[in-house]
Curated annotation (Swiss-Prot):
Gene name as annotated: POLR3H
Lineage, highest ranks first: Eukaryota, Metazoa, Chordata, Craniata, Vertebrata
SUPFAM superfamilies, per database record: N-terminal, heterodimerisation domain of RBP7 (RpoE) (SSF88798), Nucleic acid-binding proteins (SSF50249)
Keywords on record: Antiviral defense, DNA-directed RNA polymerase, Immunity, Innate immunity, Nucleus, Transcription
GO biological process entries: defense response to virus; innate immune response; nucleobase-containing compound metabolic process; transcription by RNA polymerase III; transcription initiation at RNA polymerase III promoter
CDD domains per UniProt: RNAP_III_Rpc25_N
NCBIfam families: rpoE
Region of interest: Disordered: 158-179
Example of a GO MF term: DNA-directed RNA polymerase activity
Protein name: DNA-directed RNA polymerase III subunit RPC8
Organism the protein comes from: Homo sapiens
Gene3D superfamilies recorded: Nucleic acid-binding proteins, RNA polymerase Rpb7-like, N-terminal domain
Length: 204
């Protein structure tokens, strides 16, 4: 679920921080820049793990700050495909079951990846597994807040870097702005025995 990723970045340290230890100042700046940020095709950065190498620092004309090229390792949330995770149901919609891990919310289990047969209860706004028993179908509700075990089957990165307006965009009104996409999304599945709500598989 968590991996160490080697990165390189140039860190700017303002003059009023020169009295501090360089490593402490650099660590603080890197955490400010990367913590809780999604790096495209890498994952969600959690925190700095360690600094492996500091290159020479430079002060450029007109800027009293030091600029140091830093090699470091960062703790990144990037589960591998087919990994089993446990989260909580954040909500349900016709698009599927939305799951949260507490620190990461952009997880979707689409309808075709639920335990089958499944239906969406419009009145309750929840997905229901119509579990077949000898006495007939027994409805198992996927309520908000329930713990759920799922398999990661896909991931999607979206480049959310800011771009300049195009000529076509200039003619549209502000009310027609496109919906903001999540920079990193996981797709899950519970269509296997043992997956789904933890309460379904609790032995008596």
């Amino acid at each position: 679920m968590f991996v160490l990723v080697e990165m390189v970045d140039t860190v700017r340290i303002p003059p009023w921080q020169f009295e501090r230890k360089l490593n402490d100042s650099i660590a603080e700046e890197l955490n400010k820049k990367l913590a809780n940020k999604v790096v495209y095709n890498v994952g969600l950065c959690i925190c700095l793990f360690d600094i492996t190498k500091l290159e020479d620092a430079y002060v450029f004309p007109g800027d009293g700050a030091s600029h140091t090229k830093v090699h470091f390792r960062c703790v990144v949330f990037h589960p591998f495909l087919d990994e089993i995770l446990i989260g909580k149901i954040k909500g349900c919609s016709p698009e599927g079951v939305h799951v949260s891990l507490g620190f990461f919310d952009d997880i979707l289990i689409p309808p075709e990846s639920l335990q089958q047969p499944a239906k969406f209860d419009e009145a309750e706004q929840v997905w229901v597994w119509e579990y077949e028993t000898e006495e007939g179908a027994h409805d198992l509700y996927m309520d908000t807040g329930e713990e759920i075990r799922f398999r990661v089957v896909d991931e999607s990165f979206v480049d959310t870097s800011p771009t300049g307006p195009s000529s076509a965009d200039a003619t549209t009104s502000s009310e027609e702005l496109p919906k903001k996409e999540a920079p990193y999304t996981l797709v899950g599945s519970i269509s296997e025995p043992g997956l789904g709500l933890l309460s379904w598989w609790t032995s008596n």
